[in-house]
Amino acid sequence: MFLHGYLSCKETFAKQVDYFSRFYRVTAINFLGFGGSVSLSSPFSVSDYAAWTRQVFALLGLEKPHVIAHSFGCRVAIKMAAQDKELFDKILLTGAAGVILKRSLGYKIKVRTYRFVRRFAPKFAERKFGSVEYKTLSPVMKESYKKIVNEDLRGDAQKIENPVLIVQGRGDCTTPIAEARAYLQNLKKGTLVEMNGGHFAFMDDSLTFNLIAEEFFYGGTRIESSI
């Protein structure tokens, strides 16, 4: 099962789908609001996306699949696994989002400035201080984005019983190694592997990533399965 990142789509996993579908049953979905999927009618939190994804599992008849999740998809996978240890078998996270580290003084000043300016010139504040991805969102998606990025999932990670592998791109500046290590400290059965690449390490070096994933899931032994 593949769960994509924010402002992304299932097609980002094209090389993984192509590789694994030769030997295993593979499922990749687009979250609501992304990749041509239906738009959100109300702001979704991580829990809302987790509940929606569970409904997709039921509709597709998925039973305890392995999961590969990227960035925002990691948030959803972590939330789901924390709620029910039987949903997944093994979990692979890459570019894992969902950890809020201690904010720097510069960040705090920027936030306070933004809040002050927003009181008098909200549109200017959004243009000046909003992130690149935030600026592209619809009003509903902006409210959803706020809910998502302001939730720290380390508490959920502590509840996960499944084996978890975090594959971290050494050049990832979006979700840096400190966040991966923070997750690792809160996982009961967690392992961290670093590889060359950035936030999209699974695309930067797909073959290495695929081999790491296959070794984690199957120990290098392929089990034939219908597609």
Task: Tell what function each PLM region has.
Residues L101-N162:
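Conserved alpha/beta-hydrolase catalytic His-Asp/Glu region
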Residues L184-F200:
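Catalytic histidine neighborhood in serine/cysteine hydrolases
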Residues C173-E179:
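Conserved alpha/beta-hydrolase "acid-adjacent" motif
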Residues K159-I160, I166-Q168, D172:
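Short beta-strand/loop motif that positions the catalytic acidic residue
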Residues R75-Q83, F88-F120:
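Flexible "cap/lid" loop of the alpha/beta hydrolase fold
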